[in-house]
């Protein structure tokens, strides 16, 4: 299970990122009461995640990692907003619920299905978005970065920082871990390449 603790970031740093967040919402004309940013200490390193209700969690490690490159953090926040705007989390809840109900009807455990459905929300935190969903969120970030006078290459910078951070802490103790790391790096490298292509298009406009 994923474990979150209260943030240990200085209040001044949290306020700095919160100000960035509010600026993003204003620029994109998004409802500030719907989109909430939360800081948490996370035992699995630098990360950010979007929840169905519009909440976005950023870990202490990702804020620290991108402290010297605020544009990279903005690119990540836009990516997470993209997940919410495309309702990816809600779609995953719907898929999980439908699958749960199907199995419940097949095996006659309707009562147990209720508990599983209630657990679907927390399960989202442990389930990766599909590649198509990730691609849509990437595109949302690429498309909106220029609105802040930021090159789409900032997303590539963010992914590079994350890849290097997680590679440094990844413990490849067996073949399965090594395969997982390799697959993660391939996906990340694909994201970086796509982001740089957007950057070239941006320069040509």
Give the ranges of each region predicted by the language model.
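A Zn2+-metalloprotease active-site environment signal
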Residues: 1-205
């Amino acid at each position: 299970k994923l474990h979150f603790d209260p943030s240990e970031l200085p209040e001044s740093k949290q306020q700095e990122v919160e100000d960035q967040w509010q600026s993003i919402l204003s620029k994109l004309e998004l409802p500030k009461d719907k989109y909430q940013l939360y800081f948490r200490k996370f035992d699995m390193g630098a990360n950010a995640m979007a929840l169905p209700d519009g909440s976005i969690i950023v870990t202490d490690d990702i804020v620290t990692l991108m402290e010297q490159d605020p544009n990279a953090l903005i690119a990540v926040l836009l990516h997470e907003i993209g997940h919410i705007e495309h309702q990816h989390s809600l779609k995953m809840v719907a898929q999980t619920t439908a699958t749960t109900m199907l199995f419940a009807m097949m095996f006659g455990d309707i009562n147990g299905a209720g508990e599983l459905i209630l657990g679907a929300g927390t399960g989202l935190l442990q389930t990766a978005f599909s590649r198509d969903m990730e691609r849509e969120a990437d595109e949302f970030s690429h498309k909106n970065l220029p609105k802040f006078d930021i090159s789409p290459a900032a997303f590539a910078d963010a992914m590079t920082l994350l890849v290097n951070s997680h590679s440094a802490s990844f413990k490849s103790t067996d073949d399965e871990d090594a395969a997982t790391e390799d697959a993660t790096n391939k996906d990340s490298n694909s994201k970086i390449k796509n982001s740089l292509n957007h950057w070239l298009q941006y320069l040509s406009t």
